[in-house]
Structures are given as structure tokens and as C-alpha cells.
Amino acid sequence: MRGVWKSKVAIPFLASLVLESGAFSYSKANEAMQAHDAAGATRMHTTPGTPIYFQKLFQWMRLRLFGACLAATVILGIGAPTGWGQQAQEKSRDLELSRAVRPWEFLPVTGTRAVLLGNESGRMEAWVYPLKILREFHLKFRSEGRVLPAEALARTITVRPESSTILYAADTFTVRETFFVPVREQGALIILDVETEQPLEIEAAFHRDFQLEWPAALGATYLDWAAAQHAFYFGEEQKKFSALVGSPTAAEPRAEFQTNYSESQESSFRLGPTAKGKERKLIVIAGSMEGPAAAEKTYRHLTADYADLLKESTEYYRNFLAQTVTLDLPDEQIQRAYDWSRVSMLQGMVTNPFLGTGLVAGYRTSGVSQRPGFAWFFGRDSFWTSLALNAEGDFANSRAALEFISKFQREDGKIPHEISQGANFVDWFKGYPYPYASADATPLYIIAVNDYVVESGDAAFAKEKWQSLQKAYAFLKSTYDERGLPQNFGFGHGWVEGGPLLPVKTEFYQSGLGAEALRALSNLARVTGQEEISKTLEKDFEKQRSLVNASFWIADKKRFAFALDKNDKKLDEPSVLATVPMWFGLPSEAEAVPMIQQLADIDHETDWGMRIISNRSPLFSGGGYHYGSVWPLFTGWASVAEYRYHQTFPAYANLRANALLALDGSLGHVTEVLSGDYYQPLSTSSPHQIWSAAMVVSPILRGMLGLEVDAIHRSVKLAPHLPADWDRFSIENVRVGKNTLLFNYVKRDEGIVLETGLTSGSDECTVEFRPAISLKAKVQKVDLNGKPVPFQVETREGDQHIVVQFPVKTGKYILRIWLLNEFGYSNQPALPQLGSASRGLRVLSETWSASRDQLTLEVSGAAGSKYELEVWNAGLIQKVEGGELGRKPGWTTLWIHMPPSDSEPYPHARVVIHLWPKVPPG
């Protein structure tokens, strides 16, 4: 259970608590903080048993005291200094992840033009796009008359955005093998740092696998030793494709062979002996699509300049993280998962020398085939990922991904489903069934372009793509049936590509995307100055929205059908796919909330994410790719939808499940698909899936923090639904047109403080702050820089939102919201042990009494289990039915005991919390 950080430096709500006198200016506070930094005096106190996750605590404490002093100077009329909010330039997050080796886990090291794919035992394959060079690369250690396979000695794996290192340890030596792929080079390096007591020699071995990515092929290829380069040369008869694999110290080559009597696919070379002490060895892999001379040039460049290239790659990722939306969160696991997921998405950007630059879908080893997971270009993967890229402010890569896919739009307007990296070598678009297999890529294209334009403010892109967008809309309309619903049958699959859920005429998922595409196109027409077209499309959208909801809603069961069959009959198979229309807010709250509550139960939601259908369905199989498995993609859809409809407990559980997946499995990455029965990736899963990483970023930014930017209108909305035990966060580098903003949020017993201001730019923009509070809470007043400001309170079934709008230009803005009787509870779900079934708590619904003195929770959990919730403002609790209060340092806890049951392994229960009108004195 994660502890909640409590600063030794109190963050007061009122300025009078900050200052002993008005003379304590910002500059003195800053000097004090710098002295404090130098002394290294701050230490963190955690509750017993709490993991030490808060490695960045001091930076936050420095920021918070700085903010408190700044708030005081504003309130007291003291001039604030320039240069406020430059924390992003000062930070360099340490993203290194390390653990004991799991030999079976996937290990990717990526660049934009090359990639190494393997596992934590050190076995690798190498690609220089679109060319596969080798597989089964591994090391052998020769020491004291023995030959030791490296995988038997692999002890620790350490990953960083730019490289990964395996530590091998034996009795008398260690070797650190660092895999590194420069960002923009057609090659890779393996750096070996040796430390030994006895003479040691390393042998590098591999299987040549010199072929193009599927479905293309090179035909006859060969291997030879190039003595001048100390490397094996890979070639083919036309001498267009070539590669070199070697080392400056390579010697004693042994090449693959085949005779009538024996054969070996393995080639190897030795790196020269290390007598004793420390030494560095280097292995270089270079490829080219332009002949042997180009490959040799790259080989020499990598050999001579690898140290500079490693530094450049480190800076590349550091700069990317510093220039996109940066968070500082109280939960270090979610913090790291967010940053690593941003890196993972960036690692999906690939440059193919024949096709261009776009987003691939994911990575896995290809083995003896030429299919490296999904390391080629997909339409809908790119579009779902672009929504996360836009949210984090990575507009350049979002635009590049959209540009790439749109280049291959079919003449009738249909958007491609997938484009192999070998597509230019074959008749891909006419000779194969895959390029335009899906129907959902087309509406997603329109939606993704609109999202990019709104978030980035790039109206010129909308004008440039208008003809393409019109063609896409024309194709979408051509798929409508007589009622006006877009069809899958005969036009391309929706989400489900195969299995027992098919055939269907149209999915709710597909029809929802079709409706949202109309709204998106209406806005794009408005942005491009076509008001009449925009108004017509807006009316069409409202009609389509009503039609879609009515066509799939099953009123007596309070849920949406998965699909319609060929006779327009509703197929009552409740599915997480329904959360896609909810992501965009298409259903009403009266329709969405009851279905979300059904999806939150254990038959749909596992501890590691959302199943596609209930495990109680006769169609379910835990290993069914499209009929029972858990996809982080689904989990992200559900989380964003649940936050949109204020169902924060399942929303956070799903967000956290995806975040924790990023720190398990292939370190720093989120897998494609997992079993629906047990916490275990499917055996065919792509372990580094790009849109899975996107479904960490979108639920955090779009969901939990409610961050929405409209750069066209220079406005930003922040509508956080925070776990009750979160008392602060910071958001930096929020780009709104030419401006960037910073937000610092602090919650205390007295209320909420939001600090904001421009960190670059000078254009006025509008901030709308909409924090969620409980229905128990009462808003006393709101002020901005010490002056009262108008506000509204929007009340819903499950929470309230305080709504405050204010302009931001120059200067700093301190918004304070005074609250009474705020109340909340939280839970920190964890992943189970590998191979285990779900056992976590589910909060299915919350119901408040009209007088706000009673909160009823409907929950489900494993029979006989005990669950812990942490309570905010526990002094309000009068008594609890169905649970009991407890204490731990700094927190009151609510324990829920699920009843034992022989018949129902996951029973439901009810917890009723009775509350005082206000906290009793004493």
C-alpha cells in the first residue's frame, strides 16, 4: 500500500500562515531554498511498510514552498519576479528501471531507423528498416578453460529510454552488455564493459537472417568475412541491400556452413582476450538499402562516434520529456509509468526509407519469420495514439503520423488499416487483403485530425486536408444502411476482426465512431471558414447521435448492445467496446452510468484491466483474442469514459492497472493483450504495443486530470477527479497556441489552491478550472489573487464540480477555493502475482442521501477477503455499517470484510457510511 506524502514544510492555505512579515520576499525564499538544496537537509518520512517511491520529493517540496511564498507576495501586493515556472528546464528525470532478470521477458531497444528485439537473457535479433539482418544473437564467455553461455549468468536488467543493460556475473568476472540503437542511424551497437580477475574472452554468435519484412523477400543472400572491417558482410546478388556485423577487435571468425553430412546456421567471432582488470569491447551492426559502400560508411561512423551518439540519444529523450506535458504526481509508480509511456509512444515513430515516417503499432521478436510483432504502420493504432500525443503536446509526431496514413487513402476515401514496411516491394494495396481491412480507421481519421487541429491550433492542416477529409466522409456515408447506420458487414470489420462475436451488421463501437466523426468534421468545417457546411454537419450529428443511442440501447437491462445482426436485432453481449462512444460523450448520463457500473464488476474488470466481454458469457474464453482477453487499449477506453461520466473509482482502478503494467513485463512498456483468466500476457502478445502506452497517457491527462486544450480559441480546461489521498500535483509545458502554462494544485483541509501562469508566450488565454469535490462538501468562497471571483457549482449524481473561469496573460494567478466538509475515500489497487486470478475490490456504485448524511457503497470482492480504503476527513464519520474504521500513521482506514461464500466466489456487499453534518468539535 502506497503511503501519502506529507511535507515537513507545511503548505498553508492562508498567507498569514506563511509570513512572519511582508519583508519575506520571493528572492529571500529562493535563496533559502537554494541553501537548503545544497545542504541536502530534507528527508522523507513514510509510514511503516511503505515503498520508497518518492525519489523526487525534495523537488516538489521546493516547488511547493516557492509557490506558497509566491502566493503570499501576490496577496500582500509584493511584486512577483520574472522567470517563474521554469521547473521543466531544471528537471532531468531519472527514468532508469532495474530488476532481477526474467529471461522470458521481452527487451526492445529502438531507434527511428533500426531496432534490436530480444529478451532479458540477451538473445537478440537486429533490424535496419525494412531489413532483418540477424537473429539469435548471443554471447559466450571463455574463462578458465570453460565456455559459459551468457544467458546462464544474466542477473540484472537495467533499462533507460536510450539503451538497456544486462549484467552478467560469474565467480571471477562481470560483463555489462549495453544494447544501444542511435535515434537516426541505420544500425546498432552492443557495448561490453568487462571486469575480470582471470583471463576472459567473449565470443559473439548469431544466425544470419538477411531478409525484408513480410511479405517481401530478397531471394538469394550470402555471408562473407570482411577482414579489413573485422566484420561479417551480408549481401545479395543485386548488391543493393547490405550489412556489416563485427567489432574493431573481432577475430577468429566462424561462418555458417552446410554440407552433405552436417550443417550449422551459427556464425561467430571472438573479441580478443582481456587478461585482467577492466576493458571495453564493442560490437557494431550496420545496414544499408544503398549498397555496400553506404553500409561500410555507417559501420565506421558507429564505431568511431558511438560515445557521442549515445550522448545525443540521451539528450533526445531528455529534451522530448522536458518539452512535452510534464507531470509531478504524489504516486511515483504512476509518475514513472506516465513518463515511460511517453517514451514508448515516441519509440513507435519509425522512418522507412521507401515509405516515409509514421507510427508503427508495436514490437515483438519475429523468430524465424519476418513479422516483428506489429512493427509496421496501422491506421487505427496511429489515430488512437495520436489522441495521447496531442494530449501531451507532441504535435509534430501526431501530425507526422496523420500525414503518413493519409498518403495511402484509397481513391474512394477509405483510410488504410495497415501498411507493411515491405509494401513498396510488392503489390500491397491491390494484391493483399490487409491494407483496407477495417472500416473503423476511416471515422477515426476524421476524429484524430480534428483533435490534432483543436489541441495544436494548426488550422492550416485542416485546410490542407479538407479534400481528404471530405473523401473519408463520403466513404463513411457510402457504408450507411437504410436507417443511416454505418455498416461493417461488406465494408470492413469494426473492432472485432474474428471469432464467435461475428458476424454482425454494425457494432455500437463503429456506429459511435461514425457519429463522432460528424461532430469532428463539423468543427473542422468551422475552423476552415465553412460555416454553412459546419451547421449542416452539426445537425446531422445530433440526428446521428440520437439514432445510434436508440438503436443499441436495451432499456430493461440498462446497457448497450454490442452490435446489431443482419436483421437489425440487438445482440445483448455487454462489452467494454461501449466505452468508446462514451469516451466522446455520446450517450446520456442516464444511459452511460448504469452500463459503466455493470462493466465495473468482476466479470468484466480484472485486476489488470478490462475483458472484451463478461467471463460469464458462453462465448468467453480467457485466451480469446477478440472474445475474452484483456487489452490495455480497452482498459484505457474504459478509464477515460468512466472519468467523463464521473465514475472515479473504476476509472482510477483501470488507469492504475495500465500504469502498473508499464512497470512490469517488458520494463517501461505496456503489452498488447493479456489473458482474461489470469495475470499473464497472451503467448502471442506484442509486449511493446504503442497504443497500449497511449492508454496510460490519455487516462491520466484526458481522464483523471481532465486536461483539455483548445488552441484555436486559446483556452484550457482542467477538471481533475483525484484520488482522495492525493493532495497535490503539478503540470508543466501545457501548450496553448504560442503560450505554455504551468499548473500547481494543492489540497488542504481548508480547500484547494491552484497556481497558474504563462511560462512562455504573452497571448491572453482562458483557464476553466473544474475540480471535482464530494456531494458532502460546501463551497464557502472563491478568490483569485485575493479578490472574490464568481463561480458555479454543477451537481451530479456522484459528485460536484466547482467551475471558475478566468483570463491568464502576464503575471501569476493564485486561485483559492474555501471548502467545508470535503469527504472522500481511496484505494490503491495492485497487480496480482504473475499467473494469479483477480482478487481486488470493486466499488460498483455510490449513492448519497438527499441530506448528504449517508453514503452507500455497492461493492464486490473475493469471498472472505478484507479490503482497506483510506479516508479523507474521517472526523465526519458517525458510524459505518458493513465495515469498520481503523488507524494507521497519518490516516484513518475503512476496512471492508467480504462475507465468506461457498456458492459465490466474488459476492456483492453494501457499506453504509453515516456522516455528521460537520466535523464534531474535539
Task: Give residue ranges: language-model regions.
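Bacterial N-terminal signal peptides
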Residues: 16, 67-79
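Acidic/polar, glycine-enriched structural segments that form the non-catalytic walls/loops
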Residues: 84-98, 158, 173-176, 180-373, ...
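C-terminal capping/lid segments that line or modulate ligand- or cofactor-binding pockets
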Residues: 87-135, 374-378, 385, 430-455, ...
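Aromatic-rich carbohydrate-recognition surfaces in CAZymes
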Residues: 196, 275, 279, 306, ...
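Non-catalytic C-terminal accessory modules of carbohydrate-active enzymes
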Residues: 130-136, 140-185, 602-604, 637, ...
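Boundary at the C-terminal end of the N-terminal hydrophobic targeting segment
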Residues: 25-29, 85
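Extended glycan-interaction surfaces of carbohydrate-active proteins
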Residues: 289-291, 328-376, 400-437, 442, ...
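Structural helix-adjacent loops and short alpha-helical linkers that scaffold large soluble proteins
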Residues: 327-336, 352-353, 390-402, 452-470, ...
